[in-house]
Amino acid sequence: MTAEIRLYITEGEVEDYRVFLERLEQSGLEWRPATPEDADAVIVLAGLWGTRRDEILGAVDLARKSSKPIITVRPYGLENVPPELEAVSSEVVGWNPHCIRDALEDALDVI
């Protein structure tokens, strides 16, 4: 992949955010941070749902209005995500760097 993807990633004061950034770097994906409005895709860290629900809902709403893919990442070590997130997600993935990259490439139709 040669194109740089603009990503909005939900942030928080939890370890999940730091670990996700490490996994994203390991994926080999070329990306840069963006606002929800300017992003090519929105990444929702489901582990932040309890503390950042309003922020997440705002980003999801913007993504849906703009027909941007929403990739939800399961809480670290868990299989389930909140049903509200699963219903609006383009894909739900775990923490494998290659799965994260593949989900983004598939959602954005990148070869």
Curated annotation (Swiss-Prot):
Q: What is this protein called?
A: Protein MTH_538
Sections of the chain in a coiled coil: none
Keyword match Magnesium: yes
Its function? Not known. Could have a role in a phosphorylation-independent two-component response regulator system.
| Co-factor(s) | Mg(2+)
| SUPFAM superfamilies, per the entry | Hypothetical protein MTH538
Its assembly, as annotated, is: Monomer.
Q: Which InterPro entries match?
A: ThsB_TIR-like_sf
Keyword annotations from UniProtKB, A to Z: Magnesium
What disulfide bonds does the UniProt entry report for this chain? none
Q: Which Gene3D superfamilies would you find in this protein's record?
A: Hypothetical protein MTH538 (3.40.50.9200)
| Keyword check for Cytoplasm | no
